[in-house]
Amino acid sequence: MARRPKGRFIDGIVLLDKSTGMSSNFALQRVKRFFNANKAGHTGALDPLATGMLPVCLGEGTKFSQHLLDADKRYLVTAKLGERTDTSDSDGEVVQTRAIDFTEAQLLTALDFFRGETQQVPSMYSALKYQGQPLYKYAREGIEVPRESRPITVFELNFIGLEGDELTLDIHCSKGTYIRTIIDDLGEMLGCGAHVIMLRRTQVAQYPYARMVSLEQLEALVAQAHEQQIDPSVLLDPLLLPMDTAVADFPEVNVPDAIAPYLMQGQAVRVPVNADLKTDELVRITLGDIRRFVGIGTMNEDGLLAPKRLIVIHDEPAETD
């Protein structure tokens, strides 16, 4: 008999405000521990230097984390001009120092180059893999390997300010965009070099900035619960966002209660749908009049709703530590 996973069955998404100096995995494990969750996963790592929004999916919410990985992101970044580092951020070694000598017009022209659809060559100091190894492992050994450029889109690049040798920008971009690489490339275009000294992710998909919560706040709530002799879940669970918020932009297909059991067994079912839906388009599946979210699916060539990823409804609690 398979052993039940430790932790409770709790489903949802925590908008963590990650602090600087910690890895995304460390932050993830802390959140999982605070909520006593049986499963947890984050939706796109932030560098230790970076702070800000790190959605953490709990329980069945982990099934939809890929859709947040694919979502647009927004960052506030401050770059130090005049110095280039080997990692393109302040965690690296300075490899070149140059004078800062450009006009406002040259800066604005350079910024415009990065707007819209472009190709970006990822930094050697990234988690992308080459022959099974992360690029940063090669970089640490002084080995440079070939990297293919990748298409990215910068939807917005807003100039926030320039104070002395520090330039601050607001960047709204597509998945897979390396802000460090943009700053390094910008520094080279300006002829002075640059590297990231502050990076904060302010948005993932349409999640509100105001709903973020830090590890310190979570820890304080757990301590408060212990003082009040109540279960920490009483104070923590209201912070969770519904897991279907990860796919809120998918069109909804509602399945009548009468045929819901067939769908939940993995069968494709015929339901009334919007004529505008395309074959193989991902949809958000809800059940009955209460429109309970149960997963995602696609409309197949026969006009049937085919489940792709369904949540598991647990009737029994998981084991606790």
Swiss-Prot record:
Keyword annotations: Isomerase, tRNA processing
Protein name per UniProt: tRNA pseudouridine synthase B
Name of the gene this protein is made from: truB
Top-level taxon in the UniProt lineage: Bacteria
Family: Belongs to the pseudouridine synthase TruB family. Type 1 subfamily.
Any single biological process term in GO: mRNA pseudouridine synthesis
Statement: the UniProt record of this protein carries the keyword Iron: no
GO terms of molecular function: RNA binding; tRNA pseudouridine(55) synthase activity
A Pfam family hit: TruB-C_2
Function as written in the Swiss-Prot or TrEMBL entry: Responsible for synthesis of pseudouridine from uracil-55 in the psi GC loop of transfer RNAs.
UniProt entry tagged with the keyword Endoplasmic reticulum: no
Active site per UniProt: 47
Protein species of origin: Shewanella baltica (strain OS185)
EC number: 5.4.99.25
Catalytic activity: uridine(55) in tRNA = pseudouridine(55) in tRNA
Entry-linked SUPFAM superfamilies: Pseudouridine synthase (SSF55120), PUA domain-like (SSF88697)
